[in-house]
Structures are given as C-alpha cells and as structure tokens.
C-alpha cells in the first residue's frame, strides 16, 4: 500500500511515469523501508497505464461489490417514526436502575 501511495504522490506532483528511484526517494523521506521486489512488481503492472483510468476502473469494481450498508440505513430509519416513545422509556428505565443501586448500600458503607 505504501508503494501505491508513493506512486500516487509522484503522479500528483506532476511525474506522469514515476521510476523506482522516484518512489524510493519519497518512501525514504518519511523513513519507510523499501522492498525493491514489491516496488518493481508494482511499477511493471502500472507501466504504460493511465492512473486516472485505473482509478475509474477500480471504482466501477467497488460499486458492484455488495457492502451490506442497506440494513443499517433501514434500521436507523425505523425508529425515526416513533422516536419520542422509546427515548422516554429509556429514561424511565435508567431512573429505575439508579434507585436500585442506591438502595443496595442501605445508607451506610461497609468500609467506614
């Protein structure tokens, strides 16, 4: 991931085709170790490709992946219709619990 980040930083800085030396300089400037084998693999896979096209293709792939976020939105929308009643019930339950806790010590401490 750090190699991808360094590659993107170099592209954003205006270098359309960063070399291994460019990525090494970026990574060493922040104290990262450089694995030349992984870096060369990334550069070989990205050589001759436009980074904006790769990002667009990646977005399309992520858009087709189910993420399960729909269940959360439905659950969050359901209490909105009757939101006042559950909130009032929760406050009543909290008050009941506080009374029970205060009665447990019977007005004195065992360690006095």
Swiss-Prot record:
Keyword presence, Acyltransferase: no
- Extract one GO cellular component term from the record: cytosolic large ribosomal subunit
Q: What keywords appear on the UniProt entry?
A: Phosphoprotein, Ribonucleoprotein, Ribosomal protein
Whether Ribosomal protein counts among this entry's keywords is yes
User: Which domain of life does the protein's organism represent?
Assistant: Eukaryota
**CDD domains, alphabetically?**
Ribosomal_P2
Q: Which InterPro entries match?
A: P1/P2_N_sf, Ribosomal_P1/P2, Ribosomal_P2
Q: Which Pfam families match?
A: Ribosomal_60s (PF00428)
Annotated region (Disordered), positions in chain: 83-112
Task: Provide a GO biological process annotation.
Answer: cytoplasmic translational elongation
GO MF terms on file?
protein-containing complex binding; structural constituent of ribosome
Q: How is it modified after translation?
A: Phosphorylated.
- Extent of Basic and acidic residues compositional bias: 89-98
PANTHER family to which the protein is assigned, alphabetical: 60S ACIDIC RIBOSOMAL PROTEIN FAMILY MEMBER, LARGE RIBOSOMAL SUBUNIT PROTEIN P2A
Instruction: Describe its assembly.
Output: P1 and P2 exist as dimers at the large ribosomal subunit.
Concerning its family, UniProt says: Belongs to the eukaryotic ribosomal protein P1/P2 family.
Primary role: Plays an important role in the elongation step of protein synthesis.
Name used for this protein in its record: Large ribosomal subunit protein P2A
Look up and give the organism this protein is from: Zea mays (Maize)
């Amino acid at each position: 991931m750090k190699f991808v980040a360094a590659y993107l930083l170099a592209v954003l800085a205006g270098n359309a085709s960063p070399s291994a030396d460019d990525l090494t300089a970026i990574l060493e400037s922040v104290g990262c170790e450089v694995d030349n084998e992984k870096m060369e693999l990334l550069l070989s896979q990205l050589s001759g490709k436009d980074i904006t096209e790769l990002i667009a293709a990646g977005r399309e792939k992520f858009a087709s992946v189910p993420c399960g976020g729909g269940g959360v939105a439905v659950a969050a929308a359901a209490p909105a219709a009757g939101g006042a009643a559950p909130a009032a019930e929760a406050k009543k339950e909290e008050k009941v619990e506080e009374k029970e806790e205060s009665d447990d010590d019977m007005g004195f401490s065992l360690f006095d």
